[in-house]
């Protein structure tokens, strides 16, 4: 029984390292898994083992898939002239949930950061330049987060790609759908005002 308790505590500790899960949430999740081991824990463990073996980074865009190329890069229905640049895979998946973009993606793998000593060579920026030439890209949409590092990265990429003559754009920033002005920070309101459009 002591070994089992140790294993359970180890599982809780591992779960607590996941983003969004603290010790209390991890403990609840583990208890649920144990109570529903046939319906949840075993299928989860089997699926995690398969994903651990098969998941890999797409050699083209940086998305996560199970082959050398992800499903998006293999989809011939995707617009080939547009590429949406995102910081990480979670951002790509968020864009896909919106179902508005029908082109291809490029995952940078982070942002430029002087504090964290991350330079252009540490990101997938050289691969982006190579894809521009190889794939005949005509428009690059910079969908980077509105953080200092995200905006610094966007400006760097824009400066790098400007000589190519490609159309460069970024996502609009401002008031979210359903948002109330009273609850927004000053920077968001300023960005929304600058990005206003005619009706």
UniProtKB/Swiss-Prot annotation:
Residues 81-176 form the Toprim domain. PROSITE patterns: TOPRIM. Keywords: DNA damage, DNA recombination, DNA repair, Metal-binding, Zinc, Zinc-finger. One of its GO terms (biological process) is DNA recombination. Gene3D superfamilies: 3.40.1360.10, RecR Domain 1. It comes from the Bacteria. The keyword Nucleus does not apply. Coiled coil: none annotated. A zinc finger (C4-type) spans 58-73. One of its GO terms (molecular function) is zinc ion binding. Belongs to the RecR family. May play a role in DNA repair. It seems to be involved in an RecBC-independent recombinational process of DNA repair. It may act with RecF and RecO. This is Recombination protein RecR.
């Amino acid at each position: 029984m002591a070994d089992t308790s140790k294993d359970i505590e180890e599982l809780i500790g591992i779960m607590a390292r996941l983003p969004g899960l603290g010790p209390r949430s991890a403990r609840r999740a583990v208890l649920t898994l144990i109570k529903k081991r046939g319906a949840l824990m075993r299928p989860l463990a089997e699926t995690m083992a398969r994903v651990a073996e098969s998941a890999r980074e797409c050699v083209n865009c940086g998305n996560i898939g199970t082959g050398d190329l992800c499903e998006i890069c293999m989809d011939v229905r995707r617009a080939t002239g547009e590429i949406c640049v995102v910081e990480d895979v979670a951002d790509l998946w968020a864009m896909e949930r919106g179902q508005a973009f029908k082109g291809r993606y490029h995952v940078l793998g982070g942002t430029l950061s002087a504090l964290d000593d991350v330079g252009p060579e540490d990101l997938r920026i050289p691969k982006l330049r190579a894809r521009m030439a190889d794939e005949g890209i005509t428009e690059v949409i910079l969908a980077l987060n509105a953080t200092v590092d995200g905006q610094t990265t966007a400006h760097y990429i824009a400066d790098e790609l400007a000589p190519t003559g490609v159309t460069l754009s970024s996502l609009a920033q401002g008031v979210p759908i359903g948002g109330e002005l009273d609850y927004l920070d000053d920077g968001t309101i300023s960005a929304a005002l600058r990005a206003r459009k005619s009706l």
